[in-house]
């Protein structure tokens, strides 16, 4: 996959302040505040920064954690997993494989068939109808 590389100033000019804070500076939106937390429409969730398809809405589930949760990415190659030891915790950060946008974290407490919970910030994704 061809990487998209931009300066922080370029990202800042194309994203709104919250998207920039979360996607480029590894922030986190407040729990239960994101527009996709309770979303039930069908479609494909894309990276807000580069439009890469990330998650199929059919893999979304209600985890009760306050952020949209999915049990699998649309393709394993769409994500990069990075060990995250910030805030006194050991977690696995997930970023977009194309543009390195911070998306959220993945945890080993999800439903079958994967047992994974991709906990994703709503500001990092865009739900679009299937083609």
Swiss-Prot record:
Catalysed reaction equations from the record: L-methionyl-[protein] + [thioredoxin]-disulfide + H2O = L-methionyl-(R)-S-oxide-[protein] + [thioredoxin]-dithiol
* Gene name in the database record: msrB
Q: Does the keyword GTP-binding apply?
A: no
What cofactors does the UniProt entry give for this protein? Zn(2+)
Q: Which SUPFAM superfamilies match?
A: Mss4-like (SSF51316)
Please give the Pfam families that the UniProt record associates with this protein.
SelR
Indicate what this protein is called per its UniProt record.
Peptide methionine sulfoxide reductase MsrB
Task: Summarize where Zn(2+) binds, as residue positions.
Answer: 47, 50, 96, 99
> What are the alphabetically sorted keywords of the record?
Metal-binding, Oxidoreductase, Zinc
**Which residues constitute the catalytic centre?**
119 (nucleophile)
Q: Which GO terms describe its molecular function?
A: peptide-methionine (R)-S-oxide reductase activity; zinc ion binding
Cellular component aspect of the GO annotation: cytoplasm
Q: Which residues form the MsrB domain?
A: 8-130
* The protein's Enzyme Commission number: 1.8.4.12
Q: Could you tell me which NCBIfam families the record lists for this protein?
A: peptide-methionine (R)-S-oxide reductase MsrB
Cofactor: bound how, per the entry note? Binds 1 zinc ion per subunit. The zinc ion is important for the structural integrity of the protein.
**Gene Ontology annotations of biological process type:** protein repair; response to oxidative stress
Name the family the entry cites.
Answer: Belongs to the MsrB Met sulfoxide reductase family.
Give the InterPro entries listed for this entry: Met_Sox_Rdtase_MsrB, Met_Sox_Rdtase_MsrB_dom, Mss4-like_sf
